[in-house]
Amino acid sequence: MYNHFKSYHLFFSCDYESIPYEFKGKQYCVDFQVRFDEARNCIQVIFEQTSSKSDWRVNFNFPSKLYDKFTFDGKLIQLKVHRGWGNMWLVCQSTVRQKIKALLDEHPDSFIEVFGWSLGSGMAQLAAEDIYFKFGIKPYLYTYGSVKPFYGKDTYNFVVTAPSIHG
């Protein structure tokens, strides 16, 4: 896979990692890259846009699903997310976390940027929330052709008011 993103003055190509998975008898894959930008001391997490017929099936898998439970400000939080992107995120979550952790161990003073457009914007939003709650780091989130992966009034209110992403 080949794509371009522009971050401030930086222009680079993406060589996406692809993880295949099956859902209800159909084949899918999630495409992403976790990289380190030495010039800016920045970890970048990048999710590919909608690029195939199977990606469109993911986009139209609307029913909500329950997301991981976690504690925030002493309260147990249970978010609802778009089923297609939620399933896709769960497929790559541990790999993305491992890659981020390895880069944070090497570069503890770095900051994190998360990018995505179209389908990738839903993935990027889920990843940004996950990074904050897993690592305690507020990532910078950049989405293009953005979607809304979080469902429900309570979930929306939490996501909008939580201090998890740099504005």
Q: What positions do the PLM features span?
A:
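Non-catalytic, mobile gating and regulatory segments of ester bond hydrolases
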Residues: 1-115, 119-167
